[in-house]
């Protein structure tokens, strides 16, 4: 198991602020998985890839779905869109799993898909292709520019809420009316 070097930010959500200029990230809901002096990595859990499901992905990889239910695959972000990642509860892990915050793990190896197909995988999980990545200081700068709102997340929002509802639900859970957010943080 690998631990995250900056656990105080990993395991949180980045919610795109309503004034997000980057079209790729408008209404994005990023599960922040790693954050350190070299940069940050997260998965966009607010968007699915049309016509791609877990079963179709597993068949492409030569893995029989077995006992795992079929679910949509998330568009995790623009970096390495062919790379699969599974964000999941900590009740299952492999030696290659990275612990994310206090409650999740991120596994990027096929062993998690094999475990899911046998009914031996994590209880809660979601699959994504690609990820959102930031270089050193880049996410810090975007947060200063009021592109992102940082929030806590619960398992229901992460694993049960439909992807298309997560942005609005994330703000509601934080007690924030996103329509009233100021577009310039710290300015009167």
From Swiss-Prot:
| Source organism, top-level taxon | Bacteria
One GO CC annotation:
cytosol
Question: Which Cys-Cys disulphide bridges does the record give?
Answer: none
Q: Please state which protein family the record places this protein in.
A: Belongs to the UPF0301 (AlgH) family.
Show the HAMAP family listed in the entry. Answer: UPF0301
PANTHER family per record: UNCHARACTERIZED PROTEIN YQGE (PTHR30327), UPF0301 PROTEIN YQGE (PTHR30327:SF1)
Which protein, by its recorded name, is this?
A: UPF0301 protein ZMO0349
